[in-house]
Curated annotation (Swiss-Prot):
Protein's name according to its UniProt entry: Non-specific lipid-transfer protein 3
Job of this protein: Plant non-specific lipid-transfer proteins transfer phospholipids as well as galactolipids across membranes. May play a role in wax or cutin deposition in the cell walls of expanding epidermal cells and certain secretory tissues. Has antibacterial and antifungal activity. Displays antibacterial activity towards both Gram-negative bacteria, P.carotovorum (IC(50)=11.5 uM) and P.syringae (IC(50)=12.0 uM), and Gram-positive bacterium C.michiganensis subsp michiganense (IC(50)=11.2 uM).
Keywords: Antibiotic, Antimicrobial, Fungicide, Lipid-binding, Plant defense, Transport
UniProt-listed GO biological process terms: defense response to bacterium; defense response to fungus; killing of cells of another organism
Family according to the record: Belongs to the plant LTP family.
Molecular function via GO: lipid binding
Tissues showing expression: Seeds (at protein level).
Keyword Glycoprotein attributed: no
Disulfide bonds: none
Length: 25
């Protein structure tokens, strides 16, 4: 959805999807 960079790195995207991080680097 919002984090479509999962192709590059899913790790930094996980916390964003869970709602822990305001925005992935």
């Amino acid at each position: 959805k919002i984090c479509q960079d999962v192709k590059q790195s899913l790790a930094p995207c996980l916390p964003y999807v869970t709602g822990r991080a305001p925005k992935p680097a």
